[in-house]
């Protein structure tokens, strides 16, 4: 496997890993809201949203390989 092929494979893996984290952030944002911590819930939602934006950058990186 060439270095660019390895990198493309890694980038796809990182997307999957990032998606899993987004799901976890969303779940904990809901839990934080349910136990009354609206501030924490909002922060976790913001983290999830920023992480969703990363997916687009990973996809751009794949295209650039």
Where are these regions (language model features)?
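N-terminal acidic leader/helix
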Residues: 1-26
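Short hydrophobic/aromatic patches at helix-to-coil boundaries
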Residues: 61-65
């Amino acid at each position: 496997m060439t270095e660019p092929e390895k990198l493309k494979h890694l980038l796809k893996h990182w997307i999957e890993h990032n998606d899993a984290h987004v799901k976890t952030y969303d779940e904990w944002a809901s839990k934080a809201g349910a136990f009354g911590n609206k501030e924490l819930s909002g922060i976790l939602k913001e983290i999830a949203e920023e992480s969703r934006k990363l997916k687009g950058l990973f996809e751009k990186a794949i295209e650039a390989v």
